[in-house]
């Protein structure tokens, strides 16, 4: 396998959105009933009945059947990071070069990575996620995404679980359904989806390290989910026509070089009438690439969230429609269209962790590469907060569509 580029420059330390969020209304329906609706319909024991939902003012429930065991997960990832080789650290740092590029600028891609740039991007993604997934597991972003803000009083992890349950509701999952998860990470979202609905998830991811963890976790949970190592830019997908009842992905599609080609392939493997859920990074109408402040914020934010492309909502909508999907919902899934409170929570936690790690490195209780890793991880979190509060970008843009 080709290696990530050996040298790169690592970056140093009024709503203009066209569509309002529906989330505040969604949550009033979802939060007591996200699990209870499946219990009522399918006999799954996931919480209290929703028979008195309309006048129920009790504390909202969140299904934790497949929630990560945080202490065990933390120490397992900590040990993995402790044992990293110098080459793994170097490859991880070098992999950030792809986030200074964009699929839309092929000339710069070729100039930086060479004519086989698509394969080089794939190699960089493996080097990047092979380390990043363990860094993220040191906090509440083991699933490697900042969720939409579904509940202002809840944690990052609880908002993740609320959003995942809303996906199941949006795409109508029921027991026995086969669901495709693109960019499945460690399989934690897939486990939660299966536990809540009784569906069976097939996950795809480019990183063998994460796939191995997903399989181990699924076996521990006693679930039937399965996982395949696959680069979404290497098509066709390894599935028969009309194989899946539904599809979802969370913040993976900026890594896709050819959205129309991928969506056509998804249409092939989905059954007629299947619904899909996309949650992704988009640039919003307020973003102006010619504005120096906007451009600098974008330069700092893309590496933080791991984005190669910078699609717009319209980019996704057109590609979906051209592939034969009808758009059912297209909006910002966060309350008030802002993720900043959750982004800031994660940033504050990891910056606090950074101080602990730097102290331990200083007294030689941790190896020096921990300083390199945590400094890179904590770089520019506030740039992301600022872009979100200025409504220039979001990673909580939601599209629900249906195969025609």
Cite the ranges covered by each PLM segment.
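Conserved SAM-binding loop
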Residues: 214-215
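Substrate-binding/catalytic lobe of Class I Rossmann-like enzymes that use SAM or dcSAM, i.e.
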Residues: 290-291, 296-396, 404
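N-terminal auxiliary segments of SAM/dcSAM-dependent transferases
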Residues: 60-138
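Conserved SAM-binding loop of SAM-dependent methyltransferases across substrates and taxa
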Residues: 186-197
């Amino acid at each position: 396998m080709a290696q990530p580029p050996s040298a790169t420059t690592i970056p140093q330390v009024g709503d203009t959105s066209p569509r309002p969020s529906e989330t505040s209304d969604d949550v009033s329906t979802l939060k007591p009933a996200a699990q209870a609706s499946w219990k009522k319909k399918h006999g799954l024991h996931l919480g209290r009945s929703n028979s008195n939902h309309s006048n129920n003012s009790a504390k909202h429930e969140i299904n934790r059947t497949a929630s990560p065991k945080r202490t065990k997960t933390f120490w397992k990832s900590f040990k993995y990071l402790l044992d990293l080789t110098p080459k793994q650290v170097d490859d991880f740092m070098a992999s950030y070069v792809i986030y200074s590029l964009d699929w839309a600028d092929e000339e710069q891609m070729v100039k930086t990575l060479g004519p086989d740039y698509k394969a080089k991007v794939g190699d960089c993604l493996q080097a990047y996620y092979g380390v990043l997934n363990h860094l993220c597991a040191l906090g509440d972003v083991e699933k490697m995404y900042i969720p939409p803000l579904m509940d202002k009083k809840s944690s990052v992890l609880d908002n993740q679980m609320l959003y995942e349950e809303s996906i199941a509701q949006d795409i109508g999952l029921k027991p026995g359904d086969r669901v495709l998860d693109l960019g499945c990470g460690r399989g934690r979202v897939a486990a939660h989806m299966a536990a809540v609905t009784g569906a069976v998830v097939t996950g795809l991811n480019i990183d063998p390290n994460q796939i191995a963890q997903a399989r181990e976790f699924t076996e521990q949970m006693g679930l039937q989910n399965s996982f395949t190592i696959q680069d979404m830019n290497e098509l066709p997908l390894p599935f028969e026509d009309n194989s899946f009842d539904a599809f979802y992905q969370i913040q993976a599609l900026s890594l896709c070089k050819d959205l129309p080609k991928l969506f056509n392939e998804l249409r092939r493997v989905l059954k007629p009438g299947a619904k899909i859920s996309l949650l992704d990074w988009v640039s919003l109408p307020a973003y102006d690439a010619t504005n120096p402040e906007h451009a600098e914020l974008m330069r700092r934010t893309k590496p933080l969230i791991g984005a190669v492309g910078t699609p717009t909502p319209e980019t996704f909508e057109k590609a979906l429609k051209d592939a034969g999907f009808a758009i059912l919902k297209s909006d910002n899934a966060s309350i008030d269209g802002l993720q900043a409170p959750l982004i800031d929570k994660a940033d504050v936690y990891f910056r606090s962790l950074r101080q602990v790690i730097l102290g331990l490195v200083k007294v030689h209780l941790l190896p020096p590469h921990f300083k390199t890793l945590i400094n890179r991880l904590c770089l520019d979190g506030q740039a992301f907060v600022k872009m979100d509060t200025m409504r220039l970008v979001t990673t909580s843009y939601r599209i629900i569509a249906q195969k025609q």
